[in-house]
Design a protein with these regions (language model features):
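A short, structured loop/turn motif at beta-sheet edges
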Residues: 10, 41-46, 88-91, 114-119, ...
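Short, surface-exposed linear segments at secondary-structure transitions and domain or protein termini
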Residues: 72-78, 118-122, 145
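Flexible, membrane-facing loop/turn or short amphipathic-helix motifs
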Residues: 23-30, 128-132
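Exposed beta-sheet edge/beta-hairpin loop segments within beta-rich domains
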Residues: 7, 99-104, 111-116, 128-131
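A short, Trp-centered hydrophobic/proline-enriched beta-strand micro-motif
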Residues: 15-19, 121-123
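N-terminal helix-cap/turn-to-beta initiation motif at the start of protein domains
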Residues: 1-15
Length: 145
């Protein structure tokens, strides 16, 4: 039997809830956002991975977003209205992303996703603009379904 492709990505199947905490270079909180994230593997044409996100901001406003990942051999490729880039995984189950922002010229972020135990995961985003780090985002989530 052949092993399933992208096992570290597949480990994130399900619905996740938690927080996204944006912090500045001095580790001061800029914003704390409540998150609801659905990770799916729909097996539709080229779409290998689909993520749907609902973010609730401190002022009560809600942002909905979603994106698909296309299998490109050793990585998944993303091309959305706000970013373009790829994800891949390490041999020991860490998922990495490098995404160029379309909505912020000169900006990109690198994301590290680490699966914990008991249905928990940690994600960190390192934001760069014109080559300089300017923000980090700390995502703490738990699987709810």
């Amino acid at each position: 039997m052949t092993a399933l492709k992208f096992p570290a990505h597949r480990a994130h199947l399900g619905t996740w809830e938690g927080t996204y905490r944006h912090i500045d270079l001095l580790a001061q909180e800029e914003e704390l956002i409540q998150s609801h994230v659905v990770c799916e593997f729909p097996d539709l044409d080229d779409v290998f991975y689909r993520q749907t996100i609902t973010l609730t901001h401190p002022d009560g406003s809600i942002t909905n977003a979603g994106f698909d990942g296309i299998d490109r051999g050793d990585h998944l490729w993303f091309d959305t209205p706000t970013f373009i880039g790829k994800s891949w995984e390490t041999a020991d189950g860490v998922v990495l992303l490098n995404l160029q922002r379309k909505d912020e010229p000169g900006a990109h972020f690198v994301e590290v996703i680490i699966m914990g135990e008991g249905g928990h995961r940690a994600r960190t985003w390192h934001w760069f603009k014109h080559g300089q780090l300017y923000r980090r985002t700390l995502c703490d989530e738990r699987r709810v379904a």
